[in-house]
Amino acid sequence: MYINDKEKVIKLTQELISTKSYSGEEDKMVEVLKKAFNEFGFDDYHVDDYGNIVGRIKGNRPGKKLLFDAHIDTVEVPEPDKWSVEPFEGKIIENKVYGRGASDMKGALASMICAASEFAKQTNRDFPGEIFVTGVVHEECFEGVAAREISAR
């Protein structure tokens, strides 16, 4: 099983990078993720009291839950003029994407969303249980606090 269209992963990664989401300022990122969950065929999503977003894909039989967890905040860019690329562009140079959050952890989040969607599509949802993809807030400044809200569910 593999992702058939890597361009989807790249484009989503670039969209996530281009959305500023400093700790405490993740609202725009949550809106981007709502749109992505809809476009990638997730059954639904939920935004909790902390601002975490949880997307869900249901299999066609009861079973266990699988969680892909990512944080959606980044540290600030104190001196953007010292960057060799625009921090919020998602520029591709020699097959690598650059920008704030590219490796921590917007690229991984895009991969999680695309992989979950592709798995559901390729299996025709013939799997037991549910797949969740989370976008957790405030990780850079309060690691684990907002994530505990998701764990409690």
Residue locations for each model-derived region?
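Short glycine/serine-rich loop segments
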Residues: 98-100, 133
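Acidic/histidine-rich catalytic neighborhood of metal-dependent amide-processing enzymes
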Residues: 105-153
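Acidic/His- and Gly-rich active-site-bordering loop/insert found
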Residues: 1-98, 121-127
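Short, conserved acidic/polar surface loops in the N-terminal third of protein domains
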Residues: 77-81, 102, 144-146
